[in-house]
Structures are given as C-alpha cells and as structure tokens.
Amino acid sequence: MIRFEDVSVTYDGAATPTVRNIELDVPEGELVLLVGPSGVGKSTLLGAVSGLVPHFTGGTLSGRVTVAGRDTRTHKPRELADVVGTVGQDPLSHFVTDTVEDELAYGMESLGLAPDVMRRRVEETLDLLGLAELRERPIATLSGGQQQRVAIGSVLTPHPRVLVLDEPTSALDPAAAEEVLAVLQRLVHDLGTTVLMAEHRLERVVQYADQVALLAGPGAPLLLGAPAEIMAVSPVFPPVVDLGRLAGWSPLPLTVRDARRGSGELRERLAGHEPRQPHEQPQTAASPASRRSRLRSGRQPEVPAVAEVAGLAVRRGRVEALRHVDLSVGPGEIVALMGRNGAGKSTLLSTLVGLVRPSSGTALVGGAVPHRTGPRELIRRVGLVPQEPRDLLYADTVAAECAAADHDAGADPGTCRDLVSRLLPGIADDTHPRDLSEGQRLTLALAIVLTARPPLLLLDEPTRGLDYAAKARLVTVLRGLAADGHAVVLATHDVELAAELSHRVAVLADGEIVANGPTPEVVVASPAFSPQVAKVLAPGKWLTVAQVREALESAGLAEDGA
C-alpha cells in the first residue's frame, strides 16, 4: 500500500539529506509505528507519503514513493486526498472551519459525498472519539487535546485507505489516547485501513503496532521488524521495555500485562527494599489550620508560597472552566497538574500568568495579582511555556530569538544560547525556528522563558514532541531549577514525567481539584495516571525504572550487563 524505493530528501539550503536511501514496504491493513530520536526525519517520511514533501515543503526528493500505486512526485497532495488522510503535530494547522461538526464534515464535502452519508459518518465519528458533547463548540474554545481529537476525526470521516499520523496522542490524556488508539486498531483490523504513525510516547502505542520502523539517527538506514525485535536494539524505548532489559527478560515485554506475568522473580529480588524518592519535597506554605498548629508548637513557620490560589473560579464564555480551586506552591516545589482534556489545567496556568482574569477568588504570584501586574514586572515573577511554542517565537533564527530573550530578561548575552545548547545539542545559530521539529521548537521556547530565571515556571505539556533523551535533559534542567529554589508547575498528560519529576500531583476534573498529594500516593492509586512500572510492580510504591535499578544495584542484584 505504501512503498519507499531508495528515497532521500534534501531540503533547500541543507548540506546533507534529512533522510537517506530509505526502503520501506507497508502492506495493506497494517499499523506500522515509526520511531527514533527527535530530528532524525520521521516527519519528513510521513510528509512524503501525503505528498507534502516536496510539493509543499520544497527541497528535493530522489527515489520513489507510491501510495496505492500513485507516485507522490507526480501527484500533488490534493490528488491523494481521497486515499491519504494526514494529521500533523500541530492540529491548529488542519482546521478550516469554525465548529467541531463543520470540521468533521469538511473533508467529505470536498470529495463530493452525499449529504446522508456525510451525516451518518459525522455521527459515528462524534461517538467514536467522544466528541458528541462538543459538536457545536467553536474549535478555538477547545483544549489542545480536544482539538487533537477533532483533527483526527476530520481525517477519519472521508474513510481514507491510508492514515498518516504524526504524534497523534501527544496532547491527549491517557483515557482519550486509549480511545483513539482503539479506534485506529478497529480501522486496521475491521476495515483494512493502513496506518503509518510516528509517536514518541511508546508506552502508549508500541503494543498496537504490527511492525516497527526505526530511524536510529540522521541519515541512518531504516530498520523494519517485529516490535519486540526492534525494541531490543532501539535507542528509544518505553519504561516497560527498559524494565525488561534491566531484569533480563526474554522476550522483552511490550505491555504491562506481559511484564506483570513475568515479574515474580523481580518482585522477590525487590522484597524488603523501599524505593528512594529522587528528591525530598521542600517546605511549602501550609493550610491555615496547619499554620496555627505550628505556631502553637513553637516551630518555625513555612516559607511563603511562590504562588497561591484560593477559591478561584474562571468563566470562559458559557463554560465554567475553574471553580473553587485552592492550590499553594512553595519555593523548590514541582507540582504536576493532571486530568482529562478540558479539565481546566491550561486555564489555571493562564490565570497564574495573568492571561485570564478570575471570575471570583484570588490568585497571587510572588504576592502580586498577575492580571494587574505589568509585563516587565511579571516576567521577573513568572514564566509560561505554552502548548503552542510558536506563540513565543517570532524571529528568523535561533540566534535572534536568544538575543531578544537575553535583552527582555536583562540577562548576560549568551545566557539563552547556553540553555539552548544544553537542551538542544547541535542546533545551529542560523536555524530558522520553523525548520525545527515540534519538540525542538518547544524546547527553544522553554530556553527563552528560562532566560529570565523566574521564581515560578509554568509549563503546558512540556514533553509534547520530545523523545526520551530530550525528556531526560528537561528533567535534569527542571530539577536543577527546583534545587535553586524555583517553583515549577506543569500541566501534563505524561504520567511517566510526573512520576519521575514531581513532588506533588494535583488532579483536576471539570474545573475542580479532586486529588492533591504526594506523587506516589496519588498516581499509584489511579489506574489512569499510574506509570508503567507502578502497574507492573503494584501494590509496591515503585514509580520509575531508575528506582528499581538503584535498589538492585545497591543490593548487588542487577543482571550482569544490565
């Protein structure tokens, strides 16, 4: 169905090809997962299937790419639209209408389908993706994850024979991601749809793949094989595979269920050991009752909170986005906000940075009211890395972005560039931000915000588009900031990140905080927000492979060579 024959792609101005001598054959009715580190050319390969590369992106494509027998060099994207449906990393770039229902119908209108067929397919897709309640909502009012589901639905309604998906679950909460992947699996198994998908969150998707295609590095040859075989040699792999490598399991498990079945011996080796938390929770501002108790006992009061929210409510049009929210974040504390798409996480961050005015209640950052504080003063108190990094990027080169960030923050020249070098090794000064991958743009935006070293750092889906190595670098930077006394609040659907990094997790649902406590207590008790290691080794409090590795090594129990 999809065939690459000796394909190389070189973009205008590039000295070397982004991908080189690619050979790939995807049979009809299979789901093939494309994996590899950030920046190796995965999005380029996906774009070549839909014809966007080179017709839209420019550059030179040598070799041959065919989809259902059509050569993408001689067929422009509009001539492939009846065969190929594409969802890129940025859902906003897909939308051409204003409301959810209209967007789902647009692709079918373009193909001239009958009105009764269009109506039936729209209803089916609304139900399949859990969008029925949003059918009349303006797309601009949806959360990032809801927009991503609409983008996926808009390519499902025309019933293409081939689906090309770039990070389709990156902005989805765990439950919504499972729903989308279940729909894709049904299309593959029942309708014979061919799916080529790139995804960094392998813990979500690798078990659904018929085959895995690995691009290990820029210009590297493509390896294609069974998921377990490729995961054994891949530089990127999910926690359950990492745990299997550590424990010496063969074959490597791809699912929590498989890992649990083989975990008996590992449980015995861990018996009597307790996971060491990678960092202790710092002193934070406590509740009024706790303060009175401490004063009566003569102990020192807590350090003042960097951010404090009390009785906060926010209305956005007819939607009550937040209600009765109480949250306090102290210096050096890392708090993860979790919850379904549309639960109010991004709204809470926007309120703390002054973009949204509360309907009632209070929000204070460093003692100041955010929406009443001027930008130059606010930037020294709080910084936000938004879901869409392009909101912060406007210059033509990475060097210009960094120079502007240094100037705005009053930092020494080179401060931002040094951060970029730590987070994004190998990115040249003259690189245009639009030429970076989604994850790389997000990391550049993070470096720009960190230049001012604000006491409070807010991050909205900070690992979207990041591979495991980039995520590890991000964790190191954020831990360093917390150790220096900076408070970090991140809204995330990445349960593995929350388990590894955060001191505390607050779960939001329908605009309210329904759980708020130490990370192990909150995530282990939640099937939706529990990391893979916790599920495998439950009811223990193990959250990460690093904790297991440390326990085994301290007892001299690790496998040789693990």
For each of these PLM feature ranges, what is it?
Residues 10, 53, 64-79, 362-377:
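ABC ATPase NBD Q-loop/coupling interface
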Residues 117-134, 411-429:
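Conserved ABC ATPase "signature" region
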Residues 199-200, 492-493:
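H-loop/switch region of ABC-family ATPase nucleotide-binding domains
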Residues 163-166, 457-460:
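Catalytic Walker B motif of ABC-type/P-loop ATPase nucleotide-binding domains
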Residues 50, 353:
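Helix-to-loop junction immediately C-terminal to a conserved catalytic motif
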Residues 228-296, 529-562:
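ABC ATPase nucleotide-binding domains
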Residues 218-219, 511:
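Conserved ABC ATPase "signature" C-loop
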Residues 155-156, 450:
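ABC ATPase C-loop
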